Regions:
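Short alpha-helix
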Residues: 160-176
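Conserved alpha-helix/loop element of class I SAM-dependent methyltransferases that forms part
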Residues: 15-35, 45-49
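Core SAM-dependent methyltransferase catalytic element
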Residues: 177, 182-204
Length: 204
């Protein structure tokens, strides 16, 4: 279909290039090191922020072949040892304790079963490994949250399953991650209904 195969992937890719979003990426991605797994590689927007000297290899988990194709130009400009993994985050086909860093940016919002995905992330991480993330989340403000709930049904259609009302902090806590070393705020230059973000580096 024209919408799902051409228009929607490009709209999502474009939205992920806004200055506020890019600034969030720059806060966390440079800390990735070793054997790295990126959940929801998309069209490769995180590539410029990786410290190539710290990356042994990068696996891009991306179930969409369309998104994989959109990332081809960015991958041509990268010297990182890279391969795609065409799979879902809820069932990662990698060995337990095999990854040094898992990266997840603006992906938990659209994964059908985020709790299962976080469990899988925890499984593949080595002891001492790190989970690096930045995500938008449910607003703590009643009025903003009400607006999020109102428009979420339409937003999920436009954003390929993106949920506005998922509480990312709560998801992380219930999945056994230590959320003490995380930050959250409304990021400047972004509408409040999509502007409350949480990010951090969590060690296993």
């Amino acid at each position: 279909m024209l919408w799902s195969n051409i228009i929607q992937p490009r709209l999502i890719s474009l939205a992920c290039t806004s200055k506020p979003i890019c600034k969030q990426r720059s806060k966390v991605i440079p800390f990735a090191k070793g054997e790295v797994l990126e959940i929801g590689f998309g069209s490769g927007h995180n590539l410029p922020y990786y410290n190539q000297n710290e990356i042994k290899s990068l696996i891009g988990l991306e179930p969409s072949l369309i998104m994989q194709k959109l990332s081809s130009e960015r991958l041509k400009d990268s010297a990182i040892n890279f391969r795609f993994l065409t799979a879902s985050a809820e069932e990662i086909p990698l060995k337990t304790n095999s990854i040094d860093t898992v990266v997840c940016t603006y992906t938990l919002c659209s994964i059908p079963k985020p709790e299962l995905a976080l469990s899988e992330i925890n499984r593949v991480l080595r002891k001492g490994g790190q989970f690096i993330f930045t995500e938008h989340s449910r607003s703590p403000d009643i009025k903003v949250n009400k607006f999020q709930r109102t428009i979420e049904p339409i937003w999920k259609i436009i954003g390929d399953g993106c949920h506005l009302t998922r509480d990312t902090r709560e998801l992380l806590a219930h999945s056994g991650f230590d959320i003490q070393n995380t930050e959250d705020m409304y990021i400047p230059g972004t509408p409040k209904f999509i502007g409350y973000h949480i990010w951090g580096l969590i060690s296993k």
